[in-house]
């Protein structure tokens, strides 16, 4: 059996459908969907991953031994050497307070003292998708060979390499090959699997270099900024090697705007028309001196034309110019063009990925702007005409004329520019998908068409001795504009006038104006500026901008830095300017490119980045107090959610020192003890204007943003009438019935925590309780689950009614493993059992458990095993 590993389930399905001699059979291994089919007389199976199946992380501590030196230990006993600088203090330490341990340093908790050690801590790879890994190994044991068919780029090659390492754990001698493709067309997939190549380990190493460097820099800088001014309130202050200089670009532009000193100028403008023309045929006229910088001169000129009703045409000039067709889309140019149409870069990439997975467009993460000679452009145009009737007339013209594609400045051999494949059914696409697909399809056609011809007519007018001008452009020959109208200005048709003709003039006015500061970046322009400065990659720039919005460093579009974003950059620029400069990030990205080319090694590049970070951190730690003071006001403002209804002081987001949970508390504490719970699993932000204060109780109202769900607004006061939900009987308790007593199961919302649950009226005796979704109107059905006997309820949400069994341990839910907290039907017994198991587990951990509490830790990749030592070896 041949095992084919794709990056996602949709990709696995597409590959199976394209290669299969018949219809692929959908199957399951454990809980993972797979596709079985026959190809060239051989049994094949495709499995789709969920992106990265391994995630980089740190062990819980770094330890020191006089003979072994510094090291970390994973749960399975593997010892990873840590190349700590000699200047870092070694145990024994004068204090036993965390992060200091008897034999090392704890790096699990967020402590400033641990950051120099975290900078040099070994990186381990933990299973991010246990079920997928389990299924992958199961298939590998039954396979004769494996084909890696993940996306062909750094991330895809790393995903494939990680998957292969898991395969090697159970099938070390399995032959492996690589399929490289740029779209899910049958021809492309068939060609890729007929021409298999080897896995590019250099490319995978470059991807892992970026992964490790981003983890190390992000963890150290984020912890530092958060700890520098925490005080138990506010959000985590995110930072990173790319996002920080990107934020600095926006703040730098904002500083330019704030420092801008406007200058006064004056303009004289009005309207003109051929004599007797209708009002709709009027055209704009302006004084030949576009801007008067002298007010007296402007008023003198205006005095000559004020009230004048006619002008004489002094000259008529016509000129034609060619507008060249655009170059093919690469990722950045697509994001910029889509942003101009109202689609953010991050959303553009999500939509483009869905179009790619559906087989409608080619691979969307590319730098290439030159179509390869192997791409049959005519065939793509012909296919495009068949599936898209609206573009058929343009496609026909493209096929009839000379087809000479434009060329951009960047030519690579990995993937072609982004183009429509000519397959699929565009009519099934929704609004955003259709809008982006049309942009891509029309851009592709435009790159194959000729230039547009634009004719400009310029009129020079004499208005009572003062020179005026009027100008208008008309599209004479559409050329590529017939396919690609984006950004095209409306025709400004000038009347057919000749020298000496008289025209009427109207509404001539003198306008006082001021020069404008530099414009803020749009998201599209910011992506282009990041590319220009060497910040991020084609695959990461959009997500970096999205991240800056998520942590509230940026707001609005055009992009504007928040008070906190400005404070962070100002402080870092003062105490560690290298972090905010794009030069260091560009240098590290260049190092990764050398790894990709085989000119450098992953180990050397990551070590170099650690050294750079260590120097930056050393400077920051010297100025922690000053930096904390510099961002203090902004941190407080960022944490604020409203005014306390009791004392009027600020209510802010706080974090409990004991539970690490979030809540809203008053800045007047301890004199004022007002606190409110915060819904779990959401990002909280304040509302503005009238919506910010609850009309019922006067407490603040907040916006809650769940992960990848629709945001909702609530009053922070759980006892507020707007949050009240009446108790609802949903059934009778099965456990109580078996014990010979009656108990009702009641759906209830806690006034203290805001959480919803179902609990028996005899809970103290039976311990029966079930969790409920945080949102959605509940309806009792009176029915019970045939499998477990728990109540069946209906939850009405914006996405529709959901009929569910409330028991999270119900056998019917085994097909989809429950995530998050499990519910025990016999709570008191279950809690004791769980506690006993945890206690036993703690007692049986290895001697070095303080350094390795991550139960899922796995050995790092085979290719590096020669550099690692085990405890047994020592």
Residue ranges of predicted features:
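Amphipathic alpha-helical transducer elements in NTP-driven molecular machines
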Residues: 9-16, 43, 98, 102-104, ...
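Short glycine-centered, acidic/aromatic-flanked micro-motifs in structured strand/loop junctions
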Residues: 150-152, 336-338, 365
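Basic, low-complexity terminal or inter-domain segments flanking catalytic cores
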Residues: 2-3, 35, 166, 222, ...
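Long, highly charged, low-complexity internal segments
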Residues: 39-47, 51-125, 234-353, 357, ...
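Short, polar/flexible loop-turn hinges at active-site or ligand-entry regions and domain interfaces
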Residues: 124, 150-152, 170-177, 197-204, ...
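C-terminal or mid-to-C-terminal helical accessory/interaction module adjacent to the motor/catalytic core
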Residues: 142, 184-270, 319
């Amino acid at each position: 059996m041949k095992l084919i590993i794709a990056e996602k389930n949709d990709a696995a399905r597409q590959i199976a459908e394209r290669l299969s001699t018949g219809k692929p059979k959908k199957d399951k291994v454990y809980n993972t969907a797979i596709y079985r089919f026959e190809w060239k007389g051989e049994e094949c199976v495709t499995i789709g991953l969920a992106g990265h199946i391994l995630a980089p992380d740190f062990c819980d501590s770094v330890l020191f031994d006089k003979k072994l030196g510094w090291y970390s230990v994973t749960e399975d006993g593997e010892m990873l050497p840590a190349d700590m600088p000699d200047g870092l203090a070694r145990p024994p330490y004068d204090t036993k307070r965390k992060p200091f341990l008897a034999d090392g340093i704890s790096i699990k908790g967020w402590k400033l003292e641990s950051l120099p050690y975290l900078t040099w801590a070994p990186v381990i790879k933990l299973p991010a998708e246990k079920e997928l890994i389990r299924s992958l190994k199961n298939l590998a044991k039954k396979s004769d060979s494996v084909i890696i068919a993940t996306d062909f780029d750094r991330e895809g090659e790393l995903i494939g390499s990680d998957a292969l390492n898991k395969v090697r754990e159970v099938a070390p001698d399995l032959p492996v090959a690589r399929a490289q493709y740029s779209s899910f067309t049958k021809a492309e997939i068939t060609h890729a699997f007929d021409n298999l190549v080897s896995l590019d380990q250099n490319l995978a190493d470059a991807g892992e270099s970026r992964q490790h460097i981003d983890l190390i820099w992000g963890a150290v800088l984020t912890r530092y900024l958060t700890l520098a001014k925490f005080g138990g309130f506010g959000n985590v202050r995110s930072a990173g090697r790319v996002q920080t200089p990107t934020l600095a670009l926006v703040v730098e532009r904002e500083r330019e705007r704030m420092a801008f000193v406007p200058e006064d100028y004056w303009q004289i403008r009005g309207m003109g028309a051929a004599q007797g023309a209708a009002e709709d045929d009027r055209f704009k006229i302006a004084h030949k001196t576009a801007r008067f910088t002298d007010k007296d001169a402007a008023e003198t000129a205006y005095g000559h034309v004020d009230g004048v009703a006619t002008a004489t045409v002094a000259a008529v000039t016509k000129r034609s110019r060619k507008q060249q067709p655009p170059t093919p889309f690469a990722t950045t140019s697509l994001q910029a063009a889509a942003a101009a149409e109202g689609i953010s870069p991050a959303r553009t990439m999500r939509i483009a990925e869905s179009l790619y997975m559906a087989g409608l467009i080619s691979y969307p993460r590319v730098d290439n702007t030159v179509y390869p000679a192997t791409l049959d452009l005519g065939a793509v145009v012909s296919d495009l005409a068949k599936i898209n009737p609206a573009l058929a007339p343009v496609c026909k013209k493209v096929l009839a004329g000379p087809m000479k594609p434009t060329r951009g400045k960047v030519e690579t051999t990995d993937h072609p520019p982004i183009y429509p494949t000519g397959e699929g059914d565009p009519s099934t696409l929704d609004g955003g998908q259709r809008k982006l697909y049309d942009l891509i399809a029309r851009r592709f056609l435009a790159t194959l068409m000729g230039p547009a011809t634009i004719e400009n007519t310029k009129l020079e007018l004499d208005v009572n001795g003062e020179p005026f001008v009027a100008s208008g452009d008309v599209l004479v020959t559409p050329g590529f504009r017939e396919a690609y109208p984006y950004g095209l200005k409306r025709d400004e048709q000038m009347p057919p006038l000749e020298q000496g003709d008289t025209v009427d003039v109207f509404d001539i006015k003198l306008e006082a104006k001021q020069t404008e500061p530099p414009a803020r970046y749009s998201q599209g322009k910011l992506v282009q500026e990041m590319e220009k400065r060497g910040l991020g990659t084609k695959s990461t720039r959009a997500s970096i901008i999205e991240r800056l919005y998520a942590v509230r460093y940026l707001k609005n579009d055009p992009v504007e830095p928040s008070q906190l974003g400005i404070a962070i950059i100002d402080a870092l620029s003062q105490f560690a300017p290298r972090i905010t400069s794009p030069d260091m990030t560009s240098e590290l990205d260049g190092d990764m490119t050398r790894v990709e080319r085989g000119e450098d090694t992953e180990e050397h590049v990551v070590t170099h980045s650690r050294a750079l970070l260590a120097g930056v951190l050393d400077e920051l730690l010297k100025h922690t107090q000053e930096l904390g003071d510099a961002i203090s006001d902004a941190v407080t403002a960022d944490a604020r959610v409203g005014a306390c209804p009791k004392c009027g002081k600020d209510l802010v987001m706080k974090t409990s020192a004991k539970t690490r949970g979030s809540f809203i508390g008053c800045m007047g504490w301890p004199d004022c003890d007002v606190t409110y719970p915060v819904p779990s699993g959401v990002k909280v932000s304040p509302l503005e204007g009238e919506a910010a204060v609850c009309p019922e109780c006067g407490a603040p109202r907040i916006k809650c943003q769940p992960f990848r769900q629709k945001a909702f607004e609530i009053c922070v006061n759980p006892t507020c009438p707007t949050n009240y939900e009446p108790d609802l009987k949903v059934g009778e308790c099965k456990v109580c019935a078996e014990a010979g007593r009656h108990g009702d199961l009641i759906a209830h919302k806690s006034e203290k925590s805001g959480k919803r649950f179902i609990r028996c009226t005899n809970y103290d005796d039976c311990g029966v309780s079930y969790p409920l979704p945080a949102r959605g109107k509940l309806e009792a059905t009176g029915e019970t689950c045939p499998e477990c006997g728990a109540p069946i309820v209906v939850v009405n949400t914006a996405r529709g009614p959901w009929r569910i069994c409330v028991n999270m341990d119900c056998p019917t839910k085994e097909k989809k493993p429950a995530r998050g907290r499990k519910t025990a039907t016999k709570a008191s017994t279950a809690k004791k059992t769980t506690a006993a198991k945890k206690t036993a587990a703690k007692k049986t951990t290895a001697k070095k458990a303080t350094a390795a509490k991550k139960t899922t830790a796995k050995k790092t990749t085979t290719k590096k095993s020669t550099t690692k030592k085990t405890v047994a070896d020592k």
